[in-house]
Amino acid sequence: MNTIYTGTPDSRLYKEVLGKTIGELLEADEKVVYLDADLMSCIGTAKLPDKFDRAVNCGIAESNMIGIAGGVAAAGMKPICHSFGPFASRRCFDQLFLSAGYGKNDITVIGSDPGITAAFNGGTHMPFEDVALYRTIPTAIICDTTDVTMLRAFLFMAKDMPGVKFVRVGRKTSYPVYPEDTEFKVGKGFVLRDGTDATIIASGIMVHEALQAAIKLEAEGISVAVIDPFTIKPLDTELVLEYAKKTGAIVTAENHNKIGGLYSAVKETLDGEAKTGYVAIEDEFGEVGPQDYLRTRFDLTDDHIVRVVKETIAKKG
């Protein structure tokens, strides 16, 4: 596809776009209800309760918030919930699984500051396992947003989709990739760059790193495709298998533990169809620090992707 990627950060902050988008959803659809776990000031939604009685601060009580969302959904409304990533996943998982998933109540959950983007909030606030948890909820839909265009598109889609929908989103800047008129479809990925020697499948903040890695590899004469899956669940398995056969080497890149996330989903799909490698968090906890430090600390860099791609290509013999 034709992208607008230049490697230049967006002037818009995620939280500004998120607040504006939720306001638009509340304005456009009287069935939309916005629930927040006392973090409205962190995500650009602090003024919404002044305008909408359907914007509610549930306090620091995430499990209760998801229970409320299940009840609101059962009454025919369209709840959108927000908390920081770990509290929108592991803290309220039983309610997500039962009140939403098992109860067939349609809710959308926003988990902000996923993975290393939690930065100075530290390891307690740094979810490396949220995608893995949501993947175990039958029929759940998971999106790790690449830029604000994808974020807006997913939220407008999600409010009318059945089941549990989980979206990972940062609060600060992103790197624009998608034109505003991009047509997003659940379960359909995008080929951002084509290539023949290897394929990088990347999600969220790692899409930028993957594209930078592909540029560096191209300068060395190595042709690398870059795929953004859009939804990690359901995964575009046809596209994954197509590029496994085309390039014979697949490397995943994610801001998440290697266990249970994008790498796991891709490996489950491939079943030996290609040589594989991964760039992800190893089996460890998060820690405090600026994003640049954490990116290097956990090997979530374009240079590390370059190394893993070369190693994976070498496995082809």
Indicate where each model-derived feature is located.
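Thiamine diphosphate
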Residues: M1-P162, F166-R168, T173, E183, ...
